[in-house]
């Protein structure tokens, strides 16, 4: 038997704090079909307000927290306590799903393996696809017969049944749900969501997609939510859990000294592990040289960090594999796109050309691959990170950077 539909929050004024909040509430109130949802609660202010807005809009809401790691931290006991407290405030049920084994196998072990191979992995997009949304939807449907989940991500989805017209995109987008950037450019998280499937997009709600972080804080305080003034966690939950990414890596990988060299092989310094470096890095190299040096390659076989002056560090082409086309069908010919190659970097113009997939990608059921040629040289194209393709604020797709090269190579 399902729990009763919770009453709207009585202590909240009926006048939303901002027009964006009013628009979000109206959209939720007018949502077609069954208004029952599981809200992923991390214990932070973003997911807390998402739950509060859904309750205010009259939805039947159940809180769901994934237990990802043991110990203290945003993903652990501290987050669980705050998530439970929010559910108590909102008078909604709270459930905890133990996902530690899946998180260890799919994220931690894969992350460590990637660093050992000399790449800089992007665990957040993999976690969204393989752990978070998979676990939430599986639990919601099997245990509570709930067919939608909501989270506090700053992104938007233009569902195909929405009354608002879909964006015109380069490529075939007919019959597809479209993933869009969040309106707050400083908090937009669409970069980490490119790998979701159409089936998942159909069942997901992002109540904060039209809000800024400041509006979220303001509205959370208006609700009196216990997490309204909670400090931001780090972008990477593992860094938050261990105190820093270096502490996480030191916990799993023993120090392995090697050389820092120029592209011609000249030794200019030493390092304690290639996993502590990333492409484009300039600070913290521990190298005294006549001009600033940038990391241009991590050679796992030779255990070397390869550096170069900025004039030699630019790259204008890369190969992207395991591509997921989310808002359009896979293109058969070249298209012009904007590309984001790091979460905190802005989009840059490039031409995308589909190329033949590797046997490894095909075996993993990820048969799409492409070459990107950038209009201007880039200095932080990093194997293991995602290259996400945009048209204006729509996410066309994305994949993992496999190879960096110049246009002539």
Swiss-Prot record:
CDD domains: MnmA_TRMU-like. Disulfide bonds join 127-237. Keywords: ATP-binding, Cytoplasm, Disulfide bond, Nucleotide-binding, RNA-binding, Transferase, tRNA processing, tRNA-binding. It is an enzyme of class 2 (transferase). GO terms for molecular function: ATP binding; tRNA binding; tRNA-uridine 2-sulfurtransferase activity. ATP binds at residues 40-47, 66, 152. Its main location: cytoplasm. It is found in: Cytoplasm. Its EC number is 2.8.1.13. Catalyzes the 2-thiolation of uridine at the wobble position (U34) of tRNA, leading to the formation of s(2)U34. Belongs to the MnmA/TRMU family. This is tRNA-specific 2-thiouridylase MnmA.
């Amino acid at each position: 038997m399902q729990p009763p539909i919770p009453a709207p929050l009585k202590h909240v004024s009926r006048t939303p704090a901002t027009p964006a909040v009013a628009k979000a509430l109206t959209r939720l109130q007018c949502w077609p079909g069954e208004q029952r949802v599981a809200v992923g609660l991390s214990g932070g202010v973003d997911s807390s307000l998402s739950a509060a807005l859904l309750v205010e809009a009259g939805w039947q809401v159940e809180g769901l927290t994934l237990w990802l790691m043991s110990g203290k931290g945003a993903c652990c006991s501290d987050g669980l306590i705050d998530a439970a407290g929010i559910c108590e405030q909102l008078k909604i049920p709270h459930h905890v799903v133990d996902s530690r084994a899946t998180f260890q196998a799919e994220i931690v072990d894969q992350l460590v393996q990637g660093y050992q191979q000399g790449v800089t992995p992007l665990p957040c997009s993999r976690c969204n696809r393989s752990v978070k949304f998979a676990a939430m939807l599986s639990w919601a449907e099997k245990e509570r017969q709930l067919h939608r989940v909501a989270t506090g991500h700053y992104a938007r989805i233009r569902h195909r049944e929405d009354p608002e017209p879909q964006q015109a995109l380069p490529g075939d987008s007919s019959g597809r749900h479209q993933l869009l950037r969040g309106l707050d450019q400083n908090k937009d998280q669409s970069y980490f969501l490119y790998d979701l499937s159409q089936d998942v997009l159909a069942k997901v709600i992002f109540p904060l997609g039209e809000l800024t972080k400041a509006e979220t804080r303001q509205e959370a305080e208006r609700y009196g939510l216990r997490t309204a003034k909670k400090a931001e966690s780090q972008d990477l939950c593992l860094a938050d859990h261990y105190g820093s990414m270096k502490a996480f890596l030191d916990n799993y990988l023993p120090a392995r000294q090697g050389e820092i060299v120029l592209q011609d092989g000249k030794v200019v310094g030493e390092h304690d592990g290639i996993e502590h470096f990333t492409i484009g890095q300039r600070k913290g190299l521990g190298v005294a040289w006549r001009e600033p040096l940038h990391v241009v390659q991590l050679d796992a076989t030779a255990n070397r960090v390869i550096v170069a002056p900025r004039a030699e560090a630019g790259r204008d082409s890369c190969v992207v594999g395991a591509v997921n086309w989310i808002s359009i069908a896979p293109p058969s010919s070249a298209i012009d796109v904007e590309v984001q190659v790091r979460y905190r970097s802005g989009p840059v113009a490039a031409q995308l050309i589909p190329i033949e997939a590797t046997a490894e990608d095909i075996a993993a059921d990820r048969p799409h691959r492409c070459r990107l040629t950038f209009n201007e040289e880039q200095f932080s194209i990093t194997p293991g990170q995602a290259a996400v393709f945009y048209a204006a604020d729509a996410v066309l797709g994305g994949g993992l950077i496999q190879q960096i090269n110049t246009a002539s190579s």
